[in-house]
Amino acid sequence: MKILFVAAEGAPFAKTGGLGDVIGALPKSLVKNNNEVSVILPYYDVVDAKFGDQIEDLFYFFTNVGWRREYVGIKHIFRDGVDFYFIDNKHYFYRGQIYGEFDDGERFAYFQLAALEAMEKIQFIPDILHVHDYHTAMIPYLLKEKYHWINAYHGIKTVFTIHNIEFQGQFNPSMLGELFGVGDERYRDGTLRWNDCLNWMKAAVLYADRVTTVSPSYAKEIMTPEFGKGLDQIMRMESGKLSGVVNGIDTDLFDPETDPHLAVHFSKDDLSGKAKNKAALQERVGLPVREDVPLVGIVSRLTDQKGFQLVVDQLNTMMQLDLQIVLLGTGYADFENAFAWFGHAYPDKMSANITFDLELAQQIYAASDIFLMPSAFEPCGLSQMMAMRYGTLPLVHEVGGLRDTVIPYNEFEKTGTGFGFQDFSGYWLTKTLEAALDVYYNRKEDWKILQKNAMTTDFSWDTASQSYEHLYKELA
């Protein structure tokens, strides 16, 4: 099967979040099953700086962006069995950052037009064209409404994946003629219109052959007003083609037996090294070195979406419990200041590291006893899976991907991989933390069972890619 991914970012070339992880890992995994896989990405300045000497120039052509002719350079690298093609245009992509420009609409309109026209020129006409988030959401529409005259494109099936429904790509409808070079009939009849704007994500949901999200629970949640961000009605209408597939993680990268960032390696059969990592981390971040006290780890952006209004609200109460907290992350100034204050007030209990450090993040995943993730909403979430690989038990708000990946502890059946609370409130966060501490202190054998359960759960991309491949085969 021939599969083409088109996305705004992809590891290791350019990455800001979970989308980049997916584009870096899923194609590589699909290749293992004898699929022919290619990826089209923008050629950002950050890509040029890191990989410019490895990437080859193939050719160039020009595309129409409204009334203008724009240069489209095609670059290529073959990596991990996947052909990566890059759309090169310095005006649009040499900005010092991937997103957040005043003309993002124009930048990604150009990218989508260039990617669609490049397929024929690179001689890769896919069976499945898989696009991601709003930056490429107009592609299913353009394929069927603008490029339908190209015979070679007639058999292409499209899949659209929503990584975060909050960012929908809402623009002035004049963009249809001025940038995409199409008429406004589909806007006037309501197909592309939402809240009196051109909505790219709505277009993708209506025109794609299948729509996926990054977890089954999130697929259900976005059909509700609480999580749908205004598009819940459209999601309910198109629910027949909507499904969820949990992302995987790179299990080679997050492996306690080989991780180069750890002080001591360990495994599910011998957890003695975990205690040594805990001591090394406590020493590094300035906490008292105590094996008997549970260490609660946090690695996150400090935002409302990640639930830190609950944590900050409950910090005073948490500091009265017999525990230590190590935090790594940046975000809202109010949250940063609150954690920093508690770090100064309770130096024996709280270490607040208001920065981001990849090595320290790995050490927190590996050395903590509990990993705190109380997100208000979480399409998938990767940190909880990373923590579980190291026998660190997640404590989560049971929402989205957190609900799908963390099984709450059952004291009667001795099952579970972590702890969870359903009501999004500080009270239940603290109550659940107290329950976890009770298991840590008073039910040591149960704790070991939970650790082993967590470490043996399969979060590899091979499992996730099988689900996508099944979906592709249904279409093709």
From Swiss-Prot:
Signal peptide: none annotated. It catalyses: [(1->4)-alpha-D-glucosyl](n) + ADP-alpha-D-glucose = [(1->4)-alpha-D-glucosyl](n+1) + ADP + H(+). Pathway: Glycan biosynthesis; glycogen biosynthesis. It comes from the Bacteria. Its EC number is 2.4.1.21. Keywords: Glycogen biosynthesis, Glycosyltransferase, Transferase. GO terms for biological process: glycogen biosynthetic process. CDD domains: GT5_Glycogen_synthase_DULL1-like (cd03791). GO terms for molecular function: alpha-1,4-glucan glucosyltransferase (ADP-glucose donor) activity; alpha-1,4-glucan glucosyltransferase (UDP-glucose donor) activity. The keyword Protein transport does not apply. ADP-alpha-D-glucose binds at K15. Belongs to the glycosyltransferase 1 family. Bacterial/plant glycogen synthase subfamily. Synthesizes alpha-1,4-glucan chains using ADP-glucose. PANTHER family: ALPHA AMYLASE DOMAIN-CONTAINING PROTEIN, GRANULE-BOUND STARCH SYNTHASE 1, CHLOROPLASTIC/AMYLOPLASTIC. This is Glycogen synthase. It comes from Streptococcus mutans serotype c (strain ATCC 700610 / UA159).
